[in-house]
């Protein structure tokens, strides 16, 4: 009987990707099958995230909830991976002696060896090292179900924003070789994948080695997109998360040259105040950010922009917050992830004095979220009556009698249709805009790409000013 593996994942899409790779590694090496029931598992893994406040305590809380399973089954192995594991290391075993494995994001490929060593020696195994790119060299071939897939193209971050733990938990930026990425994605098309999302902490900072290139010559992110665009079978290209400092003119030009590159960019700004941006060590100003957006919309008039915001960074005044609100008004965002600042141990910002009352931070966050939500809903409403090219991904979560897919600008559309449409592109007429999704009806379903110029005008039926306030981006 195959052994059972239970994985609980916290945090970002990088962690989701890593968890899938953990399952792949253990399936190949030890024939483990995933289970959704921790009580039935032979191995329980927690893939953790340390971005939010009290992340460590949440991990120990979850560990405590499975401790009784270890008491009932001494052969059960419990492991902690991800960013909290990188931060805490052997301290996890000290606080929770029933933990058998502690591993970082860069050492998940060593799980089979760690498990074997634990079973032979009886001693907990801790490996939170940062081997350069070794992880990707030892991962099994990509497997996926469905027509979409995530592919990690780089790891780590070298920006060292004052509030962020990523450089300390995932290491500095390391890029996979260009040919390795292209080979993996070409293999995914053989599994039926039509849309790929490229992953990295700062994905547009990619600088990968090229086979047969001159020594020291590296492929940048724009060149990777150019090569990826030529892979037969890949119809859509997404990526996350990008950094404004790495948004080069070549990357912006790709939105003119590459129709497969979707009309959606997630570009975290964090604040609209230059003073706060400097304190965050973000490396750009509000005006520079708006300049990127203006040039993006010139290259791709229908592009959808989403972002990240931190409210209540130490020292943020009402004037600083109002600068953020003015930026939101100017850009016209299509959604955001926004949070109240939480101090992360070991980061430069952790030592900054914070005198802003928590209630004030809550009120600011609510105002910001309401503003962005209104903008996003207005964009959704303007899509009603247009025809959208949707990749049908599967059954609707809300109604299994319907289908669900995503538009080019990342809107979820639910619509009536037959299961035979799953995995294909469909032209849908948008009939209603709900709070977080769209409703549609089928016009035509096939695999033929729609000309991007035609898609732009079908999508919105108007010029760029109907999508974003370009005149305000100065």
UniProtKB/Swiss-Prot annotation:
Its EC number is 2.8.4.3. CDD domains: Radical_SAM (cd01335). Gene3D superfamilies: Methylthiotransferase, N-terminal domain, tm_1862 like domain. Binds 2 [4Fe-4S] clusters. One cluster is coordinated with 3 cysteines and an exchangeable S-adenosyl-L-methionine. Residues 3-120 form the MTTase N-terminal domain. SMART domains: Elp3 (SM00729). It catalyses: N(6)-dimethylallyladenosine(37) in tRNA + (sulfur carrier)-SH + AH2 + 2 S-adenosyl-L-methionine = 2-methylsulfanyl-N(6)-dimethylallyladenosine(37) in tRNA + (sulfur carrier)-H + 5'-deoxyadenosine + L-methionine + A + S-adenosyl-L-homocysteine + 2 H(+). [4Fe-4S] cluster 2 binds at residues 157, 161, 164. It is found in: Cytoplasm. Residues 381-444 form the TRAM domain. GO terms for molecular function: 4 iron, 4 sulfur cluster binding; metal ion binding; N6-isopentenyladenosine methylthiotransferase activity. [4Fe-4S] cluster 1 binds at residues 12, 49, 83. It comes from the Bacteria. GO terms for cellular component: cytosol. Signal peptide: none annotated. Residues 143-382 form the Radical SAM core domain. Keywords: 4Fe-4S, Cytoplasm, Iron, Iron-sulfur, Metal-binding, S-adenosyl-L-methionine, Transferase, tRNA processing. Pfam families: Radical_SAM, TRAM, UPF0004. Its cofactor is [4Fe-4S] cluster. Belongs to the methylthiotransferase family. MiaB subfamily. Monomer. HAMAP family: tRNA_metthiotr_MiaB. Catalyzes the methylthiolation of N6-(dimethylallyl)adenosine (i(6)A), leading to the formation of 2-methylthio-N6-(dimethylallyl)adenosine (ms(2)i(6)A) at position 37 in tRNAs that read codons beginning with uridine. This is tRNA-2-methylthio-N(6)-dimethylallyladenosine synthase.
